Amino acid sequence: MLMATPTSRASLNLLRRSPKPKYFSSSSCHFRPSTFRKSYPCPIWSSSFSFCLPPPRSTTSTSLSSSSFRPFSSPPSMSSAAAAAVESVVSDETLSSNPLLQDFDFPPFDSVDASHVRPGIRALLQHLEAELEELEKSVEPTWPKLVEPLEKIVDRLTVVWGMINHLKAVKDTPELRAAIEDVQPEKVKFQLRLGQSKPIYNAFKAIRESPDWSSLSEARQRLVEAQIKEAVLIGIALDDEKREEFNKIEQELEKLSHKFSENVLDATKKFEKLITDKKEIEGLPPSALGLFAQAAVSKGHENATAENGPWIITLDAPSYLPVMQHAKNRALREEVYRAYLSRASSGDLDNTAIIDQILKLRLEKAKLLGYNNYAEVSMAMKMATVEKAAELLEKLRSASWDAAVQDMEDLKSFAKNQGAAESDSMTHWDTTFWSERLRESKYDINEEELRPYFSLPKVMDGLFSLAKTLFGIDIEPADGLAPVWNNDVRFYRVKDSSGNPIAYFYFDPYSRPSEKRGGAWMDEVVSRSRVMAQKGSSVRLPVAHMVCNQTPPVGDKPSLMTFREVETVFHEFGHALQHMLTKQDEGLVAGIRNIEWDAVELPSQFMENWCYHRDTLMSIAKHYETGETLPEEVYKKLLAARTFRAGSFSLRQLKFASVDLELHTKYVPGGPESIYDVDQRVSVKTQVIPPLPEDRFLCSFSHIFAGGYAAGYYSYKWAEVLSADAFSAFEDAGLDDIKAVKETGQRFRNTILALGGGKAPLKVFVEFRGREPSPEPLLRHNGLLAASASA
């Protein structure tokens, strides 16, 4: 997922992907989506999903001083008044040592704390306001006099705000929350001020209407068109009274989305179940018991062990999932499931009223802009329309329904044959447990027994080897080159085939429930940019971070991953590749910037397909103790199990996408239906087992209420069609033909990964594939092609 949404999960089925398929999107992205950062979360089945930095001075030196980030480096045209305003800010003794305001090569994640946020952000905003005023006075409809100074303003805010927003996601404290909450309205006010600037808007329109328009590159034309459209969507055409109302709505939406995600995090942290009786945890694997004992030790039970306890279960994914999959204790499964399903739905952490207010304000915003509903606003910057999105969801739902019904019948029959008392009354806290038992029986695969073959170091080695084969890049550790926010964070350098650095990325792999948001996401730190390059460099190199929440090392063992966790790492790496391998030098359309939201999941979901490719899987599946490769027969079983319960997993994702669209098209805040009524109604056609009456999954659906996926969750399925078809190009070329794979990989790199937001995604896809996308490969990969043909 692109970080734009802390990922929330309502049940294990949400966390588990459909056999093919942010969060937490930085809430700073409510405005000007092509210029302000977004991050991209995984879909709910996995675990959950900033922008721009500098290149080294040379290919051999580790010094990055020639490209340091300088928050107060003034453009040459800055007036003396603006310069004086900057000087008054910088000269303040309390600010001179503020890490948010210092020149840096890489963000000083290790030295920023809550005390720096208020003074640092306010000083930065004062400086940027002076720059904006100067730009408005001197703006001309030319690239050097409009786009370049605008990019500098946007970039400075993006990088610095992205730094503190990232720390809030991975190193949360009450003090940091409070500081960000205090300055957030001022940051939003500036973003609105920038987005609604008439001089800038008119200058962009003048460029579009000039005789030189046709001579501009496609990337520059896309940039101009996006700026004009986004200005309209941010209210520039409204009269003063309506624009003031619009701005109040945006401020309130920003606050509400932050509060929503904080409530989800706090509610997730709040639940802890202490178990002292080993009978209660029968069936749970040693890896889970070790994790539970480790949690108990951290809570003061110093003598806790995996064998004898005590054990603490939490709602964090590495803890929650094993309970739902393996606990024979049905009462325990029910308790944990209900706790997970009801997160942030009661007491001080209740998100119900927040959801209602968010939906109400989004509808008001849409009406002010002249749209019928918020979904139309959302789709204005996407590939799809409301009608096309609904059409795709219904086509996939029809192809999935009968298979999902049969899945449930198979599950009940299997449970009955095993003598399960619940076989005739199977419900939500039973399906995951019995699905795991059926999968073990049918394919002789136990996911826990696979863990020793998927140690994190081997998985990363194999992933980097695949990237070299497909895209001709080398990835090497660069730990110590950049400050990090936790000792477990790794830092890597990406090099081209000539050995030149072209990008960098951080990787934060492990769950830290006490301070880190759940889920998995990729986000930008800095983007590739010609304008932001420092003296002596032609372009600033992109930097990304990948964040996961997988099982941490237990005892002296490395992190041993489930296959789902392996897929998640591949997924986030796909996002990072599109950010890092861009060839666009226009910073506002480089990498993932300005790509339509329903196309950004293409590279991430494409990369997941390689987890099932034999040579790739065998390169990462090495037993952590013996070095033994995963047995061939086990690989074949894993491949055969790929479409296991495909209809059920597909339907689950379609439910999330459908309720999202319904809430943003037909739901009337304050009307006869509640949000939960809508959820129940949509579930009639998208869930074989009806949801519980007390189902409150919406209260933790961060993708659409605290991220970038409002009226956009369908994007996972939309992009799934694109990604499956893209992977089929490699199948057509021959997956065993290394020469053909390399050639196809280079073509993928030169189109999908390189062109960024500078070209319409459909054009990019056609350039790679030679034709428009087809849903056939997706249905074939999921084993649903026959169902589709008869639907």
UniProtKB/Swiss-Prot annotation:
Expression triggers: Not regulated by pathogen infection, elicitor treatment and flg22, a 22-amino acid sequence of the conserved N-terminal part of flagellin.
Entry note: cofactor: Binds 1 zinc ion.
Disruption phenotype: No visible phenotype and no effect on germination; probably due to the presence of the presequence proteases PREP1 and PREP2.
Source taxon at top rank: Eukaryota
Transit peptide location on this chain: 1-82
Residues reported to bind Zn(2+): 571, 575, 601
Keyword Mitochondrion: yes
Chain sites annotated for binding substrate: 703-709
Record-level Gene Ontology MF annotations: metal ion binding; metalloendopeptidase activity
Disulfide bonds: none
Reactions catalysed according to its record: Hydrolysis of oligopeptides, with broad specificity. Gly or Ala commonly occur as P1 or P1' residues, but more distant residues are also important, as is shown by the fact that Z-Gly-Pro-Gly-|-Gly-Pro-Ala is cleaved, but not Z-(Gly)(5)
Record: active site: 572
GO cellular component: chloroplast; chloroplast stroma; mitochondrial matrix; plastid
Localization: Mitochondrion matrix; Plastid, Chloroplast stroma
Major enzyme class: hydrolase
Keyword tRNA-binding: no
Activity-regulation annotation: Inhibited by salicylic acid.
Cofactor(s), names only, from the UniProt record: Zn(2+)
Similarity annotation: Belongs to the peptidase M3 family.
PANTHER family: LD37516P (PTHR11804:SF83), PROTEASE M3 THIMET OLIGOPEPTIDASE-RELATED (PTHR11804)
Function: Oligopeptidase degrading short peptides from 8 to 23 amino acid residues. Plays a role in the degradation of transit peptides and of peptides derived from other proteolytic events. Does not exhibit a strict cleavage pattern. Binds salicylic acid.
Name of the featured protein: Organellar oligopeptidase A, chloroplastic/mitochondrial
Organism: Arabidopsis thaliana (Mouse-ear cress)
